Amino acid sequence: MAYPHQLGFQDATSPIMEELLSFHDHTLMIVFLISSLVLYLISLMLTTKLTHTSTMDAQEVETVWTILPAIILIMIALPSLRILYMMDEINNPLLTVKTMGHQWYWTYEYTDYEELNFDSYMVPTTDLNPGELRLLEVDNRVVLPMETPIRMLISSEDVLHSWTVPSMGLKTDAIPGRLNQATLTSSRPGLFYGQCSEICGSNHSFMPIVIEMVPLKSFENWTTSMT
């Protein structure tokens, strides 16, 4: 859950997001070390008049500043590729949900259940109850079982949209005529908020996403009440 003046990421609620946070810290450490070294060398050049004449045209120095950046790039690329393939891998999902973007609301269809589909609109500010979040609440939440591999099929019926839930590390484009897929697994119950992340018209900022993760038994009871 996000909070005012937040500088960092939201708490991870999926294995993919946990991997992304680790990769962010890994990359940030490398950037910090490189920046510190560069700033140190610049300050040294500005505060001293020493010149290393023996290294002005040295084959060893040129070799080092060629090989070292290559090693650093490999250290960044390998974990990045690993996460990329993890995000694309979908093995035996137990539930499939089809998401369609519209101007300016979402439609959800649970393909494993007959006639289980609904539209999800933002709750107007005037209709909010105490404690509810402005521009983030919807009339119909996406209820999903926790600790279950779920496949999301995402598309659009009009213009480009983007189905995004930051705490789950999800951001998938909804493109007319194309069906994209994403996988999600939540490690804990709760409400997780997102929004359309592709400018799609005048009401682009009024397309919130609310995922309610519940235990499997509660999900079964919900599907029974909806069908």
Swiss-Prot record:
Segments crossing the lipid bilayer = 15-45, 60-87
GO cellular component terms attached to this protein's record: mitochondrial inner membrane; respiratory chain complex IV
The subcellular localization recorded is: Mitochondrion inner membrane
All ranges on the Mitochondrial matrix side of the membrane: 46-59
InterPro entries documented for this protein:
CcO_II, CcO_II-like_C, CcO_II_C, Copper_CuA, Cupredoxin, Cyt_c_oxidase_su2, Cyt_c_oxidase_su2_TM_dom, Cyt_c_oxidase_su2_TM_sf
Give, as one word, the top-level EC class: translocase
EC number, UniProt record: 7.1.1.9
Q: Residue ranges, Mitochondrial intermembrane compartment?
A: 1-14, 88-227
Locate the residues binding Mg(2+).
Answer: E198
- Per its Swiss-Prot or TrEMBL entry, what cofactor is needed? Cu cation
Q: Which domain of life is it from?
A: Eukaryota
MF annotations from Gene Ontology: copper ion binding; cytochrome-c oxidase activity
Q: Name one GO biological process term.
A: ATP synthesis coupled electron transport
Catalyses:
4 Fe(II)-[cytochrome c] + O2 + 8 H(+)(in) = 4 Fe(III)-[cytochrome c] + 2 H2O + 4 H(+)(out)
> SUPFAM superfamilies recorded for this chain?
Cupredoxins (SSF49503), Cytochrome c oxidase subunit II-like, transmembrane region (SSF81464)
Question: What detail does the entry give on cofactor binding?
Answer: Binds a dinuclear copper A center per subunit.
- UniProt binding sites for Cu cation A1: H161, C196, C200, M207
Which UniProt key words apply to this protein?
Copper, Electron transport, Magnesium, Membrane, Metal-binding, Mitochondrion, Mitochondrion inner membrane, Respiratory chain, Translocase, Transmembrane, Transmembrane helix, Transport
* Protein residues bound to Cu cation A2: C196, E198, C200, H204
Note the topology in the membrane: Multi-pass membrane protein
Q: Which Gene3D superfamilies match?
A: 1.10.287.90, Cupredoxins - blue copper proteins
Question: How would you summarize the oligomeric state and partners of this protein?
Answer: Component of the cytochrome c oxidase (complex IV, CIV), a multisubunit enzyme composed of 14 subunits. The complex is composed of a catalytic core of 3 subunits MT-CO1, MT-CO2 and MT-CO3, encoded in the mitochondrial DNA, and 11 supernumerary subunits COX4I, COX5A, COX5B, COX6A, COX6B, COX6C, COX7A, COX7B, COX7C, COX8 and NDUFA4, which are encoded in the nuclear genome.
Q: What does this protein do?
A: Component of the cytochrome c oxidase, the last enzyme in the mitochondrial electron transport chain which drives oxidative phosphorylation. The respiratory chain contains 3 multisubunit complexes succinate dehydrogenase (complex II, CII), ubiquinol-cytochrome c oxidoreductase (cytochrome b-c1 complex, complex III, CIII) and cytochrome c oxidase (complex IV, CIV), that cooperate to transfer electrons derived from NADH and succinate to molecular oxygen, creating an electrochemical gradient over the inner membrane that drives transmembrane transport and the ATP synthase.
Q: Which family does it belong to?
A: Belongs to the cytochrome c oxidase subunit 2 family.
The protein here is known as: Cytochrome c oxidase subunit 2
User: Which species expresses this protein natively?
Assistant: Georychus capensis (Cape mole rat)
Gene of this entry: MT-CO2
